[in-house]
């Protein structure tokens, strides 16, 4: 009778362990479903999420191996019904393994929470980068508008330079006395043209360069006006001399 009672106790413990194993399996399946639901978000997260997936997969494999060991232990317990003491020791081993499985499942739950946190952090970083991109696009658009205004001013200055150059060239035949001044003016105009071309490729300094060029052009136009006045005076002197010669 004592042996039968021991066997009955063993069977009850086996049934209790089987129930614990079923519950562990249900919990594992529930965790697996949650993990499947999070996979799509984890794929979009950073590289740590991929590493975390590998760790979760290892945990799942360990859980499968633990379930196989539990099934083996249950089979050994069924074969050990004639040896109650041996069965008792086997049950203790199974209890220890079941506790380890529960600890592993708790670890798996913590890893799942960590994966969710990483995915949320990745989403937050993406939104922050998107906001910065919108700000940079606005600044770029304003910079392009300033560059267009500078290019228009440069075009106007080029036209003015062409006009000044044409006026200077028209005075080349007026008098040999002013050829040296005209060469100097042409050299200055060429220098200004080179500076103007350089200003077109450096939009950020265009406004200051345009201001300097405008002042220089005003100075050149003033010098040109003086040259014209001197040329008129020269012609008047020549005409007066010719009149005096004719009178003689």
UniProtKB/Swiss-Prot annotation:
Subcellular localization, as worded in the UniProt entry = Cytoplasm, Cytoskeleton
- Stored InterPro entries: Tropomyosin, XRCC4-like_C
Q: Which residues carry this modification: Phosphothreonine?
A: 216
Positions the record marks as coiled coil are: 2-248
- Name the segments for region: Disordered: 16-47
Assign the protein's first listed, main location to one coarse class.
Answer: cytoplasm
An annotated GO BP? muscle contraction
Q: Which GO terms describe its cellular component?
A: actin cytoskeleton; actin filament; cytoplasm
Q: Where do transmembrane segments lie in this chain?
A: none
Q: Which residues carry this modification: N6-acetyllysine?
A: 177, 215
UniProt-recorded name of the protein: Tropomyosin alpha-4 chain
Recorded source organism is Equus caballus (Horse)
